[in-house]
């Protein structure tokens, strides 16, 4: 039975975003007051992320025949993340040097309002590779779940999964309980996702209502340059990776179109993390691979954020006439290879990492962040969308390299064909 287009999440979210843009543009004061709708939806999603990751990772690892396979999957995923993230950083660096969107602005850093970025600078001072690594270890298991720290929950879930696997038959009862709990959790997700159009409407109405479409004009060159770079990265880089691994990037984008629209409305790739876990498993990737790659990718494989970081940093240098030679840019790249791993898939984290990077490099004026602050919210959509597509592609590629991919199921799903063993648990229509 064919579902009416009006009942699909895709249509509902697209309609909600359109209404949000119109409300924010024509009635900005009312639009700005819609922020709680977007915030509330994202909070509902965050509420469920920790248990989803725990259940997915534990059942995935405990259900595997060999523990060596888990270690191999993790190693391959991290290698992939590092290579592709580095490519994203390099592409952002090359494009911003060629396009030079900041040249000619001739802004004196002394005239910029440093107070506007003081909070971000303070948060950035706490960034660093050692604190980041130590922060992965939770002070307590309860604290990890309470704060919703993805990497902390992931670490505990991996250890729990290993321990449960070692118990063998003795741990079967616990395994069954967690698997049943997982089904309940995904039922809760389906209920929450019915509110996605409302969340997308609120977030978009607030963005347009508060900042206005006109605020994009002055710094439009950077925004346009960034969006085009993200599109080129997805089509050329991720498209090439997809082609060499046996699937079409455009078919994959069509497959996750509902998730992309939700991310477009909320500006946070984290808002669809639970659905992506389910959809990637539905696409033929084994649960153990999905449970490791997707959550880890939210900190280690943020392609859109990587592009943004190099472009924004060099843009500030160009706009303030701060000279950056080859060595300065190489230093920037090296620092970003480390600092970019501290970003999470949530709105605003990329800006904090940018502040941390500029502080660490020392050559760029920190006050220059004020130039980016006003348009950062408009760039977050492209960041989040690119991050989402990048993590989806990474999951399929790692699953294939680890021989944990059902290619027939993948091709059937991407071609809109239904196999008897394909579950359709992601439908919320």
Curated annotation (Swiss-Prot):
One function term, GO molecular function aspect: malate:proton symporter activity
One annotated GO biological process: L-aspartate transmembrane transport
Cellular compartments per GO CC: plasma membrane
Keywords: Cell inner membrane, Cell membrane, Membrane, Symport, Transmembrane, Transmembrane helix, Transport
Entry-linked InterPro entries: C4_dicarb_transport, Na-dicarboxylate_symporter, Na-dicarboxylate_symporter_CS, Na:dicarbo_symporter_sf
Short name of any one Pfam family annotated for the protein: SDF
Transmembrane portions of the chain: 3-23, 44-64, 76-96, 144-164, 184-204, 222-242, 331-351, 352-372
Gene3D superfamilies: Sodium:dicarboxylate symporter (1.10.3860.10)
Compartments where found: Cell inner membrane
Top-rank taxon, per record: Bacteria
Membrane topology listed for this record: Multi-pass membrane protein
Function as written in the Swiss-Prot or TrEMBL entry: Responsible for the transport of dicarboxylates such as succinate, fumarate, and malate from the periplasm across the membrane.
Annotated family: Belongs to the dicarboxylate/amino acid:cation symporter (DAACS) (TC 2.A.23) family.
Name of the featured protein: C4-dicarboxylate transport protein
Species, as recorded: Yersinia pseudotuberculosis serotype O:1b (strain IP 31758)
């Amino acid at each position: 039975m064919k579902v009416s287009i009006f009942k699909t999440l895709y249509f509902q979210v697209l309609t909600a975003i359109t209404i949000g843009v119109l409300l924010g543009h024509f009635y900005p004061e009312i639009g700005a007051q819609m922020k709680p709708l977007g915030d509330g939806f994202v909070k509902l999603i965050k509420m469920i992320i920790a248990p989803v990751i725990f259940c997915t990772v534990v059942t995935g690892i405990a259900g595997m025949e060999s523990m060596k396979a888990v270690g191999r999957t993790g190693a391959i995923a991290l290698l992939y993340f590092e290579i592709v993230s580095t490519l994203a950083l390099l592409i952002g660096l090359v494009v911003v040097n060629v396009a030079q969107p900041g040249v000619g602005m001739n802004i004196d850093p002394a005239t910029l309002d440093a107070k506007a970025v003081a909070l971000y600078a303070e948060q950035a001072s706490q960034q660093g590779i050692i604190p980041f690594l130590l922060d992965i270890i939770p002070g307590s298991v309860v604290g990890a779940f309470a704060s919703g720290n993805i990497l902390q929950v992931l670490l505990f879930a991996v250890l729990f999964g290993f321990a449960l696997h070692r118990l063998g038959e003795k741990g079967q009862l616990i395994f069954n309980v967690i698997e049943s709990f997982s089904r309940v959790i995904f039922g809760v997700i389906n209920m929450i996702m019915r509110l996605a159009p409302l969340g997308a409407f609120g977030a978009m109405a607030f963005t347009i209502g508060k900042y206005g479409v006109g605020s994009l004009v002055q710094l439009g060159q950077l925004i346009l340059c960034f969006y085009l770079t993200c599109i080129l990265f997805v089509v050329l880089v991720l498209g090439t990776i997809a082609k060499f691994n046996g699937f079409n990037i455009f078919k994959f984008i069509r497959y996750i179109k509902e998730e992309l629209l939700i991310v477009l409305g909320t500006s946070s790739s984290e808002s669809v993390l639970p659905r992506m876990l389910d959809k990637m498993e539905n696409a033929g990737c084994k649960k153990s691979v999905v449970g490791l790659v997707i959550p880890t990718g939210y900190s280690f494989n943020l392609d859109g954020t990587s592009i943004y970081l190099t472009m924004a940093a060099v843009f500030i240098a160009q706009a303030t006439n701060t000279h950056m030679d080859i060595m300065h840019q190489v230093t920037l790249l090296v620092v970003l290879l480390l600092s970019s791993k501290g970003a999470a898939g949530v709105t605003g984290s990329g800006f904090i990492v940018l502040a941390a990077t500029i502080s660490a490099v020392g050559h760029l004026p920190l006050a220059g962040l004020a130039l980016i602050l006003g348009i950062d919210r408009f760039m977050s959509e492209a960041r989040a969308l690119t991050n989402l597509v990048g993590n989806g592609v990474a999951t399929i590629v790692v699953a294939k390299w680890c021989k944990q991919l059902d290619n027939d199921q993948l091709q059937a799903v991407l071609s809109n064909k239904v196999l008897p063993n394909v579950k359709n648990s992601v439908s919320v229509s």
